[in-house]
């Protein structure tokens, strides 16, 4: 059990809290006794019981307070470390704005150019990794893992605790780096990057060790073997693993796999998107500094980035087909997944695939507080400019609430249009940031036009936005598109942008039918006052994750996360995610030291009498699996006879 360390201030605060609670309780008891003397006199036993219960409750509160560690155990006490902030992460940074914000630069064909999507400011150029670079990374990681794989949990927890404290104390810097490279707002970064990452670290510290303990399994059912044979699964590191992560959460998507890899005793080579190389370099350096501060090998974590494959450069495919990887987690799009799976198959590397989604937000007739729901819908659709794999892609509303909810949302977006821009330097108040690039603007506009041509109504937005302050920024108008039907392209394809799509359903079953009509199956939400009906919908949705009367809460650390159908397969997160990065070694052993397996004489080579050997095995099987006590006794006599 972990030791608890309380400083003097905490002890004084604890004492004063308990004393105040106790004094309040005494005051209430005295008031009762003064106001009802006769009742007290006639119910001394009741008062005694009440006093005892209150005392037990007070003791329980005290124990709960003390048993909640204020600091980590000394075995993994966090280590402080620092990291210089990059120049572009400084507040009010005056970076040069580029005419072209493409990652390609004809003058430097082997380099990746990085820009701030919100402003167009140039962040720097980085050489695309070569096949030789990849080999070196895998080799270094493998060498570091050979020692790290045998580390005890206190060393691993020390690294995570140190990382936890750094993130908690440097939120502004981390958010600014993430925003500068992705174009999102500081608020979106705080919730989508920092909060969820700290939760993952803290959950792993608190529950991860228990998940990786050997798992004893019941059995065998064989009557003879069950008395002296035990079986368990021991979870061992795989070695060097890889994670190929998307750009929409440059901090969280990068750190999530690293946290899981380090805790399970693995080394990891992370391949970030070419869109967020600048921030990924800083974040991986943060991890390596943390490892160094904890006296661990920083080579445990490596960062790779490559330009998309061409005839002259196939490094990206070389990475995913590398035989040094024992496991790959991919977060990205469906088209890219096909290439990754094809490459990974060359070395038989297992892959967890987390792809896009077309998550439905279902509002049933029993849902009442539509104003509150409109706030959830707005946040779930427009956060990070809609670039969220579990963002709301379709709002499916049963007929009783449809028109009212459409009006509420349209009125909100008309009266208070979402302000677009950049708040990285806190120069203005904004609601929605930029998109990562303008590469998909033609596609988004075409989806809207197709829907309108087929009968949908465009109430807000629908096209790209030329920002007056940031003409090089990548902005798309917050869009409200209603009366969408399944035959429209926007109902079947992932938008991954700030387009609020609304679909009208006839009834609850029609809500489910519409939700399941898309080829994806990542997540979904259902809202209503009838819990039985909500559970019916949740059980009927063909998805990997569902939230009831909430949005995206299935992305909590204790649950495995992943989709089905066109959204991929496999899970990361939760206990299952940790176990998936381990070799589940099945071990069978003797539980009684004086009993061991021997080959019976009738079965020993060479077989001296086939008939006797057959009868021996037959009697053994009967004795092992019969439900009749008499049959088992007879088999024992037969075994004794045939064994001679």
Curated annotation (Swiss-Prot):
Name of the protein in its database record: Putative aldehyde dehydrogenase-like protein YHR039C
Keyword Oxidoreductase: yes
PROSITE patterns, per the entry: ALDEHYDE_DEHYDR_CYS, ALDEHYDE_DEHYDR_GLU
Primary enzyme class: oxidoreductase
Species, as recorded: Saccharomyces cerevisiae (strain ATCC 204508 / S288c) (Baker's yeast)
Membrane-spanning segments: none
Domain of life: Eukaryota
EC number: 1.2.1.-
UniProt-annotated location(s): Endoplasmic reticulum
BP GO terms, sorted: reciprocal meiotic recombination
Family of the protein in this entry: Belongs to the aldehyde dehydrogenase family.
Glycosylation sites: 15, 565, 627
Keyword Endoplasmic reticulum: yes
Something else known: Present with 2500 molecules/cell in log phase SD medium.
Post-translational modification: N-glycosylated.
């Amino acid at each position: 059990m972990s030791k608890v360390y309380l400083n003097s201030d905490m002890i004084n605060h604890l004492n004063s809290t308990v004393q105040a609670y106790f004094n309040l309780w005494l005051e209430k008891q005295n008031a009762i006794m003064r106001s009802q003397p006769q009742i007290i006199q006639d119910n001394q036993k009741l008062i005694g019981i009440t006093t005892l219960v209150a005392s037990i409750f007070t003791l329980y509160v005290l124990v709960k307070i003390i048993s909640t560690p204020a600091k980590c155990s000394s075995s993994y006490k966090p280590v402080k470390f620092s990291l210089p902030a990059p120049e572009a992460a400084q507040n009010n940074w005056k970076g040069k704005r580029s005419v072209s914000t493409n990652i390609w630069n004809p003058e430097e064909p082997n380099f990746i150019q990085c820009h701030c999507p919100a402003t167009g400011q140039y962040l720097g150029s980085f050489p695309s990794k070569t096949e030789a670079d990849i080999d070196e990374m895998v080799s270094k990681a493998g060498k570091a893992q050979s020692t790290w794989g045998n580390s005890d949990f206190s060393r691993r927890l020390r690294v995570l605790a140190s990382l936890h404290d750094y993130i908690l104390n440097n939120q502004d810097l981390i958010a600014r780096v993430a925003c500068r490279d992705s174009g999102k707002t500081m608020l979106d970064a705080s919730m989508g990057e920092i909060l969820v990452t700290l939760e993952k670290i803290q959950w792993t510290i608190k529950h991860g060790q228990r998940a990786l303990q050997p798992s004893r399994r019941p059995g065998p059912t064989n009557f003879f073997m069950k008395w002296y044979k035990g079986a368990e699964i021991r979870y061992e590191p795989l070695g060097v693993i890889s994670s190929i992560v998307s750009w929409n959460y440059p901090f969280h998507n990068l750190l999530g796999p690293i946290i899981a890899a380090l805790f399970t005793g693995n080394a990891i080579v992370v391949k970030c998107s070419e869109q967020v190389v600048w921030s990924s370099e800083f974040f991986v350096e943060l991890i390596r500094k943390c490892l160094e501060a904890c006296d661990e090998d920083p080579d445990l974590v490596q960062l790779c980035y490559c330009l998309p494959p061409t005839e002259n450069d196939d490094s990206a495919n070389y990475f995913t087909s590398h035989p040094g990887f024992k496991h790959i987690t991919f977060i990205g799009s469906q088209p890219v997944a096909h290439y990754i799976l094809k490459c990974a198959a060359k070395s038989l590397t297992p892959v967890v695939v987390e792809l896009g989604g077309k998550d439905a937000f279902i509002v049933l007739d029993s849902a009442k507080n539509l104003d509150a729901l409109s706030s959830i819908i707005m946040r779930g659709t427009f956060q990070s400019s809609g670039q969220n794999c579990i963002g709301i892609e379709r709002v499916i509303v049963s007929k009783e609430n449809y028109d009212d909810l459409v009006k509420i949302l349209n009125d909100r977006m008309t009266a208070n249009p979402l302000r677009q821009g950049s708040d990285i330097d806190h120069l203005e108040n904004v609601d929605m940031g930029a998109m990562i690039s303008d590469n998909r603007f033609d596609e988004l506009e075409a989806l809207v036009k197709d829907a309108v041509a087929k009968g949908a109504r465009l109430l807000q937005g629908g096209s790209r936005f030329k920002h007056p302050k940031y003409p090089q920024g990548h902005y798309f108008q917050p869009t409200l598109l209603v009366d969408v039907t399944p035959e429209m392209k926007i109902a079947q394809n992932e938008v991954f942008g700030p387009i609020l799509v609304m679909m009208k359903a006839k009834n609850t079953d029609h809500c489910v039918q519409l939700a399941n009509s898309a080829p994806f199956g990542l997540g979904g939400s259902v809202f209503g006052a009838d819990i039985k009906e909500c559970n019916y919908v949740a059980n009927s949705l063909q998805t990997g994750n569902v939230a009831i009367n909430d949005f995206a809460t299935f992305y909590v650390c204790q649950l495995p996360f992943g989709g089905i159908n066109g959204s991929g397969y496999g899970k990361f997160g939760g206990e299952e995610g940790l176990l998936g990065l381990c070799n589940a070694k099945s071990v069978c052993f003797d539980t009684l030291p004086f009993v061991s397996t021997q080959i019976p004489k009738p079965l020993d080579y060479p077989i001296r009498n086939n008939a006797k050997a057959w009868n021996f095995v037959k009697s053994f099987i009967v004795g092992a699996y019969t439900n009749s006590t008499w049959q088992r006794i007879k088999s024992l006599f037969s075994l004794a006879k045939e064994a001679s």
